[in-house]
């Protein structure tokens, strides 16, 4: 399973999402729009390194 690593711009919390498990629109750079589970702000900082899990 491909995972994306996110780092929240506001609180620096790091978390993972599945490649196609997005919570909003896809931007022009194909970066998923997600909301930080720690502080609830919209997080747009994404590490484009995809990891194969399992």
UniProtKB/Swiss-Prot annotation:
Keywords for the protein's UniProt record, in alphabetical order: Early protein
Family (UniProt): Belongs to the phi29likevirus gp16.6 family.
Annotated protein name in UniProt: Gene product 16.6
Organism, as annotated: Bacillus phage PZA
């Amino acid at each position: 399973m491909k995972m994306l690593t996110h780092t929240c711009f506001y609180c620096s919390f790091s978390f993972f999402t599945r490649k196609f498990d997005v919570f909003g629109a896809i931007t022009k750079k194909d970066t998923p729009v997600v909301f930080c589970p720690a502080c609830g702000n919209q997080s747009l900082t994404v590490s484009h390194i995809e990891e194969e899990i399992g």
